[in-house]
Each structure stands twice: as C-alpha cells, then as structure tokens.
Amino acid sequence: MEAAPSEKVPAKKLSSSENLDIGVSEVVTVDAAENNSNGIKRGLKTRHVSMMALAGIIGPGVFIGMGSALHIGGPVGLIVGFAIVSIVVFGVMLSIGEFNSLFDFNFNTHAARWVDPAFGAAIGWNYVIVWLTNIAAEYTSLTSILQYWGPHVPSYGFFLIFWGFFTCYQMLGVSVFGESEYILAFIKLLFITGFYIFAIIYAAGGIPHHKPPNLFKEMPLAHGFGGIVSAFVYAGVFFSGVESVSMTAAESKNPKKAIPLAVRQTFWRILYVYFGISISYGITVAWNDPNLSSGSKTLKSPMTIAIMNAGWNHAGDFVNAVILITCLSSINSGIYIGSRSLYNLAKDGMAPKIFKRVDKRGVPWVAVHSVHLFGFLSIMNYSTGAVKAYGYIINLAGVSAFIVWTAIIFVHFRFRRGWVKQGYALSDLPFKSPLYPFPQLIGFVIGIILTLVQGWTVFKPFAAGDFVDAYILLPLFFVIWLSYKFIKKTKWVSYEDMDFINGRRVIEPTYSNEQSSDKETEDGKKTSFWNRVWKEV
C-alpha cells in the first residue's frame, strides 16, 4: 500500500521502544496491489529482480568488448581498471538499496525530491543516454556475431530482422520479460563458469601439444597508464545495468525484499564475473593477438580466440552461439530499462507527456518504441567498421555511466542528512547501507576522477573528434540542469523541506506468531535448499 503521490499524509514514526519490541527486521511492506499508482504492473518477482542484477553485468561486453579493453590495457591494466570502477559501483548499489527499500521510485525522482528537480532531470536524461547508446552497442555486437556465420549478409540485414523481433517482444508485458531474463541469466552464468574451468586447464598446460605463455609476466601492461585509463571507460559501460534495480522497484511485487537482496549480492557477482573473466582472459589471450585489433567488421571474442588457439577450431561456433544469447538478453534489458527511464521522466514532468502512455498490459509503449528506434545507430558500422563504431558508442555510454553513478551517491548524502535532520531514526530504514559513509565517499571521489580522466588519451596526440566523443556529455549534463532550472524556476531543496512521506511504503510490525519463514518465497511457497544458498551469495 502506498501513499498517492498527490496526497499529503502524516508521517508515522515508530518510537525507540516500539522498535525494540518488534525488531527492525520484522517490518514488512504492505503492498499487495497488482498495479501501482503509475499504471505499470507489478509483475517482477524477487528472483527476477535478483537475477536481473546479475544479468545486468553479464552483457556482450564481457565476451566481446573486453577484448578491446585487453588489447588497450593488457592483462594487468584490465584488472586494475575494473577493480577501481567496481569500488564506485559498490557505493552506488548501497545507496540505491537504501533508497528503494523505502521508496519505489527511480533515482531521478529521488534527486528531484532531495536535491533539486533540475538536478533530477539532468540525471534522468543522462541515464536515458546510457541506455540509448547501450542498445546501439548491443546491436553492433549482435550483427558482428551473426556475420561470423554469414559474412556475405550485410549487417543492416541482421539488424532489421532482430529489430522487428524485439519491437514485438517488448509489448508482451513485464512478467514475460522477467521470466526470459531469469532463464538467459542462468545460461550466461553456466557458460562463464565453464570458461573459467577451461582457462585454468589451459594456463596449467593441460591442453595436449600446447604450451601456454606466461602472459602476465611477458606483457602485463600494453600501453602503460593510458591503457588503464582506457579500460575505465570499458568498465563503466560493462558495469552499466547493476543500478537497474532502481528501475525494477516499481514493477517488483515485493521491493522491500527484492532490492536489498539484489544489492547484497552485487559484490560477490562483480568479484565472480569481472575479476574472474579479467584473469581468465589475461592468462589465455595475448593483448597483441591480431584478432583483437582486427579492423574487420566481425568482432571476435577473447573466448573464441582462446579456445581456437587451444586447437578446438570448431568450438568458436559454440562460443558465438552463447554470445548471441547474451546479446539478445542485453538488448532486451536495454530496451526495458531505457523505456522505463524515459517513462519515469515523463511521469515526473521532465519529458513530453506522450511517453507516459501505457497499454492494458502495463507497457509504456510510446517510450518502448522511441527508445528502440535508437538501435538504428548501430547501422553506422556498415560504413565505419564494427570495431571503430563500437568504440564511438562505448565512449558515450561510459561517460554517462560515470556521471549518473557519481550523482546517485551525491543524492544519497543529501538523503541521509535530511532523514536525520527531520528526526527519523536510522533504524526505521528497511535497508541501511553498511559502513556509511566510507563506501560512498570513496566511490564519489573516484567517480569524479574517472569522469575527468577517462578521455586522457585524446590529448597526446590531440584528436578533436575523440575529444568531443569523450567529453561532450559532461557539459551536456550541466546544460540540461541549468536549462531546466531556468525554465521551471526550480529551487535547491533544503533539508527541512525534503519529502519523506508521499509515496513512501507503509510498513507495519509483524509479531513472532505472524512472521513468515525465511524458507518461504514471497508467494508463501517453500524454497529449496539450493535457492536458499543462492540467496546468501
């Protein structure tokens, strides 16, 4: 049950004694409505949201784009670049967990409430840009993979086929989307695990008639500090999606349970996926392998290169098939998140009202089709080559991600200060960020540094086109912020005026005889032993 956004309702604060009597962990969300007040439907289960947090960080970039990052940064540069960016991501996820366990809004709405509506508009539009460019990048990957099998078919032919498919598929509703992402994420996880096993055998000399080189010893850094900086941008793009749990909150059946669970699991998934894959690539593929820097329109995955170098020439077909599945999953997620971001902007009056239109299935169809149209940007690889086009798009998406992440952490600082100043207890928060404010402070500082230095390589020698590509979104953020502020006459929100009431989920105490077992799902069904293990990791 939620307070309508347009209504002012009195805040109900639990006293310290009440908190001691019932326990903070025993507060549950009263939210049984199938549709929320926005018109979209609650069709995502806890397992969907949890898996989407995983699926969001296993995109085609893991299989394809990291080949470019390896070529630029070398094996050590790749690991260092992703390690630094992961610190920012962890701080962002803790902030989102605290927001969305209490309010099922997206972060541009949070920013509008607790900083400035104009600041919220700037964050929201930058996040839309993240996903517009991501969709184009994923289509570039998809068409490149398909050209591995059909080199004589033009890339735009493959693009048009799948563009038509996703145009129809996205209209089936959020429950279909959630179930498909759950299955695809599981397939990706299995495949990555299999490759880790292969990499260990390969590096240990377990492949007959093959002596692997010590790549970490022979060539740890490909291009010095510049290579590490370039790896930052790739990391920013490949990590894009972990914050998508903020988008799924409004369509989750139990956000209070689903969001904190997804946030807690993020650290281990980042460690397993990105550090695992960085090490695996570093010990199986040389940074100067000619296939990584090929100017052809077909991008080859380091996985494909590694397995073919091991002597399994036809294994590349299997690897490409799995990468194809990953591309389909990422495009599916990109359209979903991008369209919901645009829908939320329209709902908050920060985008044209037409994007608020929702069909009977709860799908914001105008936003879906508008966002999906930007997939046509991928067609430019027909003239520039997939590698070059992918690089252009990656830069735009990476810078947008850094800006949005840094802004989210800043909003969290404001939220915490206002929450305490208005007399609320931290124990009233369904999910409280551990070690606050240290993860956020570290992430905030690193986020600012990454935003400023990610285009460092364009200065030596100076390249005007690359400079614009690397930094154009930074001034654009301030242009949107100041333009909206001037047109709408918005004001900086003081701590005393922050709204912690409207839209806040109503919580009620659950006493011991009413508590549901941890061995039950949100539907009241018993969970298996393996599902409970999965929740812990």
Curated annotation (Swiss-Prot):
Q: Which first-to-last residue range defines the signal peptide? A: none
Would the keyword Repeat be found if you checked this record's keyword annotation?
A: no
Alphabetized, the UniProt keywords read: Amino-acid transport, Membrane, Transmembrane, Transmembrane helix, Transport
Entry's transmembrane regions:
52-72, 76-96, 157-177, 183-203, 219-239, 267-287, 318-338, 362-382, 393-413, 462-482
Mode of membrane association: Multi-pass membrane protein
Task: Kindly list the places in or outside the cell where this protein is found, as annotated in its UniProt entry.
Answer: Membrane
Instruction: Name the InterPro entries on file.
Output: AA-permease/SLC12A_dom, APC_YAT
Any one GO molecular-function label of the UniProt entry: L-leucine transmembrane transporter activity
- Kindly list the biological process annotations in GO that this record carries: amino acid transmembrane transport; L-leucine import across plasma membrane
Instruction: State where it is primarily located.
Output: membrane
- Record's family? Belongs to the amino acid-polyamine-organocation (APC) superfamily.
Q: What protein name does the entry list?
A: Uncharacterized amino-acid permease C965.11c
Query: Which source organism does the UniProt entry give?
Result: Schizosaccharomyces pombe (strain 972 / ATCC 24843) (Fission yeast)
